[in-house]
Curated annotation (Swiss-Prot):
This is Ribosomal oxygenase 2. The keyword Transcription applies. GO terms for cellular component: nucleolus. InterPro entries: JmjC_dom, NO66-like, ROXA-like_wH. It is found in: Nucleus; Nucleus, Nucleolus. It comes from Bos taurus (Bovine). The modification Phosphoserine is found at residue 308.
Length: 462
């Protein structure tokens, strides 16, 4: 299932969640990105490369370097995060390990220079200047509105969590040894210049982060220098290292990453448990007990043969399944993603408003990109029977300040009987629909459905 990124720090004291603080410029540059839709945002994000070209030739295949000589775009990138922003952030309470890592690459290894507890800007700047340490700031979208705006749209576009980290490295220094990641990475160069070397993956589309020794990675397949306004993409598993050239100002870049634990293998793991449960209800062969002392045996050839037969049976059943059960992936995504970008009073966003829907109303879905529909198990606490329900999860009330920080999160949404699925799909697949036309048996059920969705701010009367 998708996992929330956890800061890889050694700070012992985590401290309370930082207060929300604005570090925006009083009058920032206008955005060159298109925020009208998720697809429009991504198209402008990788411009001038076309989206179709990107997914056909680069996505999960090879790196893409976009070097732009565009002063307006460079100015916009610089506004996303600056070294100078750290001073105001430190004054609001950020902590080593949770929010900030301070590190250097020493003899091919990462050396963490974190202090304990709260970060003080003067100490941070001293380590940066005197120890030539790299400052890694975790999940800056918690504080920077424009990064929130970008990443929220990217989460809608990819249907996967999107995290970010800022790296600020002084001249003539390198923060991290050669390594590869378990995420798809987009790098935006914000300040200064950064010299990059990319290498052939030893584990294509890697599922885990790993450091690689210099003597194992061979010669670079790509070598270049990023300047403000440039963008770099590379697939998970791509070995890389980067340094700030001597004699120049510091470098600041942000990595925007996605698709952690979002492979077909992850999706299969998420689906298979529900499929086995449903099949076992209908097929006595799966409910039969395993042979005596099976767990004590060393040989497993006969067992493997029996299991392969069950898997073939499950495959046959899967092809005819109308609704795929999801154990965690959909819920986890809805619970942990960013809330909709909204600069007004957030209370208005999550409070139902407008006309109350009735049987004669026409309604339409709101926040379509922030809602997931799934079928999952439900156990009645009164009689301990287990069945299936339709779950509607949304991210309207999610907390921006804990996004991708590994915190326990609360799920928001609704639960309906399985018989409501067709009516829910009607609402999902229509630009607008009459409540009377919903595929439910009684008018009471129709009103119950739309009132429940309206209360959660998921539909409006048109």
């Amino acid at each position: 299932m998708p996992k929330k990124a956890r800061p890889a720090g050694d700070g012992k004291e985590q401290g309370p969640a930082p207060k929300q603080v604005k570090v925006e410029a009083a009058c920032g540059p206008s955005s060159p990105l298109n925020f009208d839709s998720p697809s429009g945002l991504f198209e402008s994000f990788i411009s001038p490369i076309k989206t179709e070209t990107f997914f056909k030739e680069f996505w999960e295949q090879k790196p893409l370097l976009i070097q732009r000589d565009d002063p307006a775009l460079a100015t916009y990138y610089q506004s996303l995060f600056r070294l100078s922003d750290l001073k105001s952030l430190c004054s609001w309470g950020i902590y080593y390990g949770r929010d900030v890592n301070v590190c250097r690459c020493v003899h091919g290894k990462k050396k963490v220079l974190n202090k304990d507890g709260r970060v003080h800007f003067l100490q941070l700047r001293q380590d940066f200047d005197q120890k030539r340490a790299t400052i890694q700031f975790h999940q800056p979208q918690r504080f920077k509105d424009e990064l929130w705006r970008i990443q929220e749209k990217l989460e809608c576009y990819f249907g996967s969590l999107v995290g970010s980290n800022v790296y600020i490295t002084p001249a003539g220094a390198q923060g991290l040894p050669p390594h590869y990641d378990d995420v798809e990475v987009f790098i935006l160069q914000l300040e200064g210049e950064k010299h990059w070397r990319l290498y052939q993956p030893t584990v294509p589309l890697a599922r885990e982060y790993s450091v690689e020794a210099e003597d194992r990675i061979g010669r670079p397949t790509h070598e270049f220098t990023l300047k403000p306004g440039d963008l770099l993409y590379f697939p998970r598993g791509t070995i890389h290292q980067a340094d700030t050239p001597e004699g120049l100002a510091h470098s600041t870049h942000v990595t925007i990453s996605t698709y952690q634990s979002s492979s077909w293998g992850d999706f299969l793991l998420d689906t298979i448990s529900g499929l086995v449960f449903d099949t076992a209800k209908a097929d006595v062969a799966l409910r039969a007990g395993i042979p005596r002392q099976l767990l004590l045996q060393a040989e497993s050839i006969a067992v493997a043969t029996r299991l392969s037969g069950f898997l073939r049976m499950l495959a046959d059943r899967l092809e005819g399944t109308k609704e795929l059960p999801s154990a965690d992936m959909k819920k986890d995504f809805a619970m942990n993603r960013l809330p909709p970008y909204y600069m007004g009073d957030r209370a208005k966003l999550v409070a139902p408003g407008g006309q109350l829907p009735g049987l004669d109303s026409t309604v339409r879905l709101q926040f379509r990109d922030h809602v997931v529909l799934t079928v999952g198990p439900y156990q009645d606490p009164s009689d301990e029977t287990r069945g299936e329900m339709v779950y509607v999860y949304h991210s309207l009330r999610n907390r921006r300040d804990t996004h991708m920080m590994g915190n326990e999160t609360e799920s928001y949404g609704l639960r309906f009987p399985l018989s409501y699925m067709d009516a829910l799909k009607q609402i999902w697949n229509s630009s607008a629909i009459s409540v009377k036309d919903l595929k439910l048996t009684t008018d009471e059920e129709k009103q119950n459905l739309v009132l429940s969705l309206w209360t959660e701010c998921l539909i409006q009367v048109v």
